[in-house]
Amino acid sequence: MAESRGRLYLWMCLAAALASFLMGFMVGWFIKPLKETTTSVRYHQSIRWKLVSEMKAENIKSFLRSFTKLPHLAGTEQNFLLAKKIQTQWKKFGLDSAKLVHYDVLLSYPNETNANYISIVDEHETEIFKTSYLEPPPDGYENVTNIVPPYNAFSAQGMPEGDLVYVNYARTEDFFKLEREMGINCTGKIVIARYGKIFRGNKVKNAMLAGAIGIILYSDPADYFAPEVQPYPKGWNLPGTAAQRGNVLNLNGAGDPLTPGYPAKEYTFRLDVEEGVGIPRIPVHPIGYNDAEILLRYLGGIAPPDKSWKGALNVSYSIGPGFTGSDSFRKVRMHVYNINKITRIYNVVGTIRGSVEPDRYVILGGHRDSWVFGAIDPTSGVAVLQEIARSFGKLMSKGWRPRRTIIFASWDAEEFGLLGSTEWAEENVKILQERSIAYINSDSSIEGNYTLRVDCTPLLYQLVYKLTKEIPSPDDGFESKSLYESWLEKDPSPENKNLPRINKLGSGSDFEAYFQRLGIASGRARYTKNKKTDKYSSYPVYHTIYETFELVEKFYDPTFKKQLSVAQLRGALVYELVDSKIIPFNIQDYAEALKNYAASIYNLSKKHDQQLTDHGVSFDSLFSAVKNFSEAASDFHKRLIQVDLNNPIAVRMMNDQLMLLERAFIDPLGLPGKLFYRHIIFAPSSHNKYAGESFPGIYDAIFDIENKANSRLAWKEVKKHISIAAFTIQAAAGTLKEVL
């Protein structure tokens, strides 16, 4: 009997203990803490402070000096050795892995036995003038070998000969002016255009559409020579002997021209070279403004239509076609012998594995290859990426590990069409679209030294504002102020003077495949020029032999503090995205941006008010979808601030909705004629790859619509793209609703 009572007592104790446990569990489940504790917030902030404090300007300077001693053109031995050097350093920094990943892509190089040049020939076919083959090397670099001469990668081979026509910047509107207002036909002509305003590949495409048989590109002092500044090496201006290199593809996001949509591996089917995507069918060649002045001096024909067609050379900028007076029998001949060949390239991919969510990735990537020394483009970004990786490694050595996985990437062959980054995205597409939270670009960290410039998805606006308020400004006169304060004062948003300007993402760098094709939230930050006063395009010595370490050290960032600020911002962005319990995206900013973009495209359409009425075109569905998205974003935000941060399932569900929102704006069918540009809200402009356009499908349908051959079909296309945009936004709103 005593034994039975003992067993009963034991079972009663166990039952009571179980009941107590269940009661505690239920209380803990239903009475949810809504906020992170003050201690956890302070710890999170302290780690970020340690990260940014670890970064040193002197280290960035040292990396930049080391990486710019030799040229590192994609596909060359020097660039492979630089990849190995970066890989070795990443391992030394303490990254969990650092691997070389190769692809075999189509690249383009000058012919080593036949030099490219432009000539003027007389009636006897005698060449009476030739442009320069090479740029004179800067002091201290006279003995450096393997410097590629100025050329335009992927130009067609050929020796076309004909009359010359000056076409200003070779923009769409420039050719419209020539053809529609001035009656000048470029068919069968060689055209000469100045660099600037738009991507060089768009210039070549426009020239081909106009019927030109070749195009010469040059950097006019009006666009690449700042007033009261000496040419390099005495100043940072462009010497007259320098010529801008660059590819002239029109890939529209395809990656390797021979394997569009698929990674360029050994097993991959390849198109024939003559079938390659976006490869020009006409010769293209760049020259310096000293040589351009000679070609332009002899032009006859019509005077320039207005001052916007005049540069700063001592010539009349007559349009042509052909030369004037006694020189009218002379022609221009191009000599272009570039060779396209399949070449192996190498990315370096490093990782720090996450401790809680290793299957969620934040990518920090930038390209390594350059046309010559590349001290600004890209190596100011390479040096910054290296210092960020070192600083994260330092945190690791002290016991810290991120919540999510960080992927560091040193891309190859960006200058040849964003090839390294695109091929890696294609190879890993199934993983990336399921697991990637964000892509932060680490291309050039400076393109000027006036103020910060940020281009990013609206999801990142608030995070950028927050972090720049906590980073000291490197600008003179702002010693006791934040980066945010100097940025706001120098470059306020045109829509809201109380906020600094943030630009839309276009293309022109390695974020393209991740944002435009895969819908991964992306952003980039660097220092830039004063756009109000500095009217020159880009920085003057862009893509020339004169882009040296000394250029940066003497003129652009002597203290390296501006590059340090960029490193701190890029690094802090990665840290917050990888280690915040809730992904720090703000969906309400996206809703506000959609309102502004919808109003903007509608106002553009109102220039054709009568046609809108005649063809029954309405934007009501678009505005309705934007309204629904705004309401869904507001409801989501209310739920987000109430989520139980101690419930990992609830946190994961909300984070998945945040992560996948950008993906919701992707149309798998792509934009018309641009299969790999799939983002319905943002895309590179069809007329300038560098610029971002909102509602690109609608914008392109409306562009020049008054000159379309079939007005009914043209407006029908507008209706179609309004419908696609409305559906996409409505569907995106659906992804924000509470999970059933």
UniProtKB/Swiss-Prot annotation:
Its cofactor is Zn(2+). Belongs to the peptidase M28 family. M28B subfamily. This is N-acetylated-alpha-linked acidic dipeptidase 2. Substrate binds at residues 200, 247, 414, 507-508, 524-526, 542-543, 689-690. Residues 32-740 are extracellular. Zn(2+) 1 binds at residues 367, 377, 443. Keywords: Calcium, Carboxypeptidase, Cell membrane, Dipeptidase, Glycoprotein, Hydrolase, Membrane, Metal-binding, Metalloprotease, Multifunctional enzyme, Protease, Signal-anchor, Transmembrane, Transmembrane helix, Zinc. Homodimer. It is found in: Cell membrane. The NAALADase activity is found in the central region, the dipeptidyl peptidase IV type activity in the C-terminal. Residues 264-577 are annotated as: NAALADase. Coiled coil: none annotated.
